[in-house]
Amino acid sequence: ATTHRIPFIDALFISTTSVCVTGLTTVDVATSFTHIGHIIIMILIQIGGIGVMTFTSFFALSFMGKSSFTSKMMLKDMLNEDRTGGLFRVILNILFVTLFIEGIGAYFIYMDVRGSLPGGTQQELFYAMFHAVSAFCNAGISTLSGNMYDPLVADKYNLHFWIAMLIIFGGLGFPIVFNYLKLLHHLLMNGIKILIGKQKHYIHTPRIINVHTYIVVISTLILLITGTAFYLFFEYDNTLGDLPLRGKLANAFLGAVTPRTAGFNVADMATLAPPTLMLTLILMVIGAAP
């Protein structure tokens, strides 16, 4: 699965960083691994991403006792689960939502890189799938040596946007996503019933979006807006200097999104201004949604 012999410790490190969706690498993933190696890494990222996100959903319950009424109510609230015994259904929902969002992301990524990568359609499709998984699972590993500032994709600003959105959705976590899916289902069902005459007006169901969801979404929006603004300000005449306005905005947005959980690079870290490095450190400390 490698193009040349690499030390066992490096292979172990890459496997660990993939399944733990950390994104740190000791070798160039693009040149050190074959296509089979990249597939293995993608599978490890997917397993780790689903595992970590599922684990974090249940982590708060792990020390509280299986039969505790408080635990059951917390589980019901966290996962938006009406029946506390329906954990298998929750796991299936997690798998479905993961594959659905990654599939949509892979489609848009492919449409943006189509005709621009060596290796033809097959390589472009794999690039799209790999990066959709890597972004949604917040791994930050790329099959290009230059990551997101590789010459092949550096000017693909739509690609930067889709990568950022996948990172954001993956970082929010499944309890948040399920909350909004339940709200969407409620709104659609109300609309359909009004259209077919089964009810005359919108029926409000309170507390579909819980307090935890409100806090996470609002804090995420604040961090995205302020992070992008500060990144743009600090790097405007530095790494963003030669880019068009659209490129500056796209790179600043991804540059503010990726430090919190993912690890994709929109520029060589050694070339960033000291204030940008401090901003990156702060965003890394804050991280994603709890």
Report each predicted region and the residues it spans.
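Membrane-proximal intracellular helices of multi-pass ion channels
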Residues: 1-290
